């Protein structure tokens, strides 16, 4: 056989009559199977009936305890030779001092800016050389150091990970560089209405005395106060093995993971770690509209909500179904109303951000400026309707199918599975939690949805935050008479 470049493939030298005969043979074979019989059996007026999906089978979560009290969880997934490691620490922004918001996220950032004998460029270069992805971050509830690496590069990548977690240098020059970079990023937020709403809304809902009310990355003033000694102090107080858990997902066994991690983290020194701070949710106030003026804004950004629920709530599964119906999917009520029916927005959504403490419930959209008041009317209509009217059975079934049929995708890759299993470590959930997830979603009834809607969505106590051009939207909002209007700035502070 010789390559035929004109055909882009291989031929056997067939030409002329031989090629024609071959074609006739193909036609003859095809004609043996008439299609009319199959067509007669199909009723194309009805959609095909799908069989029930197979039960979701998840690998077991195996556990062990390393020297120093470090807890290890391993999820074996051997189809692809990659490994994901997540070190989860009780070092989130809930630990930020009241006078220094942003310290936890800044400390997490600094872990990659020099560790052991490596500077920031050497850390980045070595991760790239190993084909690894190394990330450090902090949320309100936890700090996470994560590593994704091919199995054959696991051991040298673990050496790099150990340096980053155990031996950060916090060089003054790098603290200064990262501090100035963050200050510039914060200044830029003032030009982004969506970012403004993301900062102002939790500050208004919770107030600055609650951990969830403080900006995750701090303010311009608090960032200017960041110094090496404060970063090192925070690290020393929170980055301890007795306040950490390691999750390993991928092509590795429990015995192998325990051996490799003990060799690198077995000497991690325990230390006294203060309990995670508790904070009561603020008392609800009567429905109020908070207007953040952004002159010349192309759209108005709307956030409507109040304090919601903690991750440990027994209503979690009913709330997942409720939110899918209300605003958790493209076909949900809010998006169908504000986008598809009225054309006020490209997308309207809702979410219960359940955390270690009671996180916020929020419904949100960026809307046409001239339709700000009309959008608020439709938002409030849908938020009241989900409480007042029972959910029809077809809508309930569709929401439950949306959740359960999408669940397998959360465990298809080691990275996706690691992200879901990480929830178990952050929130102290049972290790078999996801094995029963679909079952508990399917057990939710229409009565459950209405019950949790009435309990956890309270229109009389909504904080309605609107970021937009005051000169264009104020009159329309006032005419709605949905509550007093209070003027706030980027940080949620009152403007006199």
Predicted regions and their residues:
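An aromatic/glycine/proline-enriched structural segment found at the starts
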Residues: 42-49, 208, 212, 216, ...
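Acidic/histidine-enriched segments that form metal/cofactor-coordinating
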Residues: 42-49, 116, 122-234, 397-419
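A structural supersecondary motif
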Residues: 93, 303-307, 326-367, 488
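C-terminal regions of mature proteins
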Residues: 40-54, 245-247, 365, 397-496
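M16/insulysin-pitrilysin zinc metalloprotease superfamily fold
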Residues: 113-117, 148-179, 329, 349, ...
